[in-house]
Amino acid sequence: GLLDTIKGVAKTVAASMLDKLKCKISGC
């Protein structure tokens, strides 16, 4: 459903943001 799609997108965005933060903090 739509809610599941939104949840999936939110998880993907959160994961990519966390990866970027990790790169800034400790390098890629």
Curated annotation (Swiss-Prot):
The intrachain disulfides are C23-C28
Q: Which terms under GO biological process does the entry name? A: defense response to fungus; defense response to Gram-negative bacterium; killing of cells of another organism
One GO cellular component term: extracellular region
Tell me where in or outside the cell this protein is found.
Secreted
User: What Pfam families does UniProt report for this protein, alphabetically?
Assistant: Antimicrobial_2 (PF08023)
Under which name does UniProt file this protein? Ranatuerin-2B
User: Which key words are in the record?
Assistant: Amphibian defense peptide, Antibiotic, Antimicrobial, Disulfide bond, Fungicide, Secreted
Expression across tissues is: Expressed by the skin glands.
Q: Where mainly found?
A: secreted
Record family assignment: Belongs to the frog skin active peptide (FSAP) family. Ranatuerin subfamily.
What the protein does comes down to: Antibacterial activity against Gram-positive bacterium S.aureus and Gram-negative bacterium E.coli. Has activity against C.albicans.
UniProt key word Glycoprotein? no
